[in-house]
Amino acid sequence: MNQKAYFGEFGGSFVSELLVPALRELEQAFDTCLKDEEFQKEYFRLLKDFVGRPSPLTLCQNIVSNPKVKLYLKREDLIHGGAHKTNQALGQALLAKKMGKTRIIAETGAGQHGVATAIACALLNLKCVIFMGGKDIKRQEMNVFRMRLLGAEVREVNSGSATLKDAVNEALRDWASSYKDTHYLLGTSAGPHPYPTMVKTFQKMIGDEVKSQILEKENRLPDYVIACVGGGSNAIGIFSAFLNDKEVKLIGVEPAGLGLETNKHGATLNKGRVGILHGNKTYLLQDDEGQIAESHSISAGLDYPGVGPEHSYLKEIGRAVYESASDIEALEAFRLLCQKEGIIPALESSHALAYALKLAQKCAQEKIIVVNLSGRGDKDLSTVYNALKGGLK
């Protein structure tokens, strides 16, 4: 057993034999690039000059009514592409280029990873094909247009529930027959090894930046670090720097959808069971017969019935806690941040914010809370408009 492939019992590489050579080649190339000073130098140059890192850490001025609480937002909404997805899309695309690949395939739910992949491919002159569920294409028309504008081919997937998991299945099928010239640029910290570790590596600058920024501003670490969790890449990115700081509570917020008591949610770590999906062992939403259940969230980017294996491990060992926020709570947090702080957040990030605002109200002592504002909400305006019927309170 390859111990590097596992987080406790979670992770691994449960794939068809056709994909074993591709994953082995990818792992070797990734390990080489981690030690390659030229690769690291080029990657961090692009993060600075092209992506616009470091992203700011913003203290909220008006949204928290409890004077004992300081709420900071890690502003991934301000980087190029509008979300944290650009960080690791660029890392993987650069790695693919070093491997001699000429074609990139990717899956996308909210469209944000698809846009980030298309951006990286345009920059690095790589052919780009994006697989996207038909249901998500309808929800995210503007992101589909953005991808095509950036030169990507968008392939509609109408099998299964026509959402993210089905797009992943189609991308894996393509890769099995095309890996000699193609890299599969997986969008979250799930999938077979080495993807969970690779995606975390290309997102960990979020947590590293927060740590130095909060020490500079407050001269101490935060009490809470909070992030939304679908597949979990933005969360593992910000959690990574604080895993050994036991005094910092790490909270992932899953989509409760229409309620945890219904079957219309995406709260995998709250309501799921351990199983295997997309090449890794992790918590999954399953029906009574062990089949993968359909997830639901108002946010397309959280609408996934699995979760990254490291999150399953962090839950098991108690290092992170996984809470949830409903569609209605996320919409209210979205509205509040717009009206109180002048920031339009992604609906994904609004789930983390919703939980943080509830937590802030309960704090009886002075506390510092950091929320990863993983993306901006331009892509969600039509969804929010329809949900609120065009009206705001």
From Swiss-Prot:
Enzyme class: lyase
SUPFAM superfamilies: Tryptophan synthase beta subunit-like PLP-dependent enzymes
Gene3D superfamilies the UniProt entry points to: 3.40.50.1100
Residues that bear N6-(pyridoxal phosphate)lysine: K85
InterPro entries per record: Trp_synth_b_CS, Trp_synth_beta, Trp_synth_beta/beta-like, TrpB-like_PALP, TrpB-like_PALP_sf
CDD domains named in the record: Trp-synth_B
The entry's keywords: Amino-acid biosynthesis, Aromatic amino acid biosynthesis, Lyase, Pyridoxal phosphate, Tryptophan biosynthesis
UniProt keyword Amino-acid biosynthesis present: yes
PROSITE patterns listed in its UniProt record: TRP_SYNTHASE_BETA
Cofactor(s) this protein requires: pyridoxal 5'-phosphate
Family statement drawn from the similarity comment of this UniProt entry: Belongs to the TrpB family.
Protein's UniProt name: Tryptophan synthase beta chain
Name of encoding gene: trpB
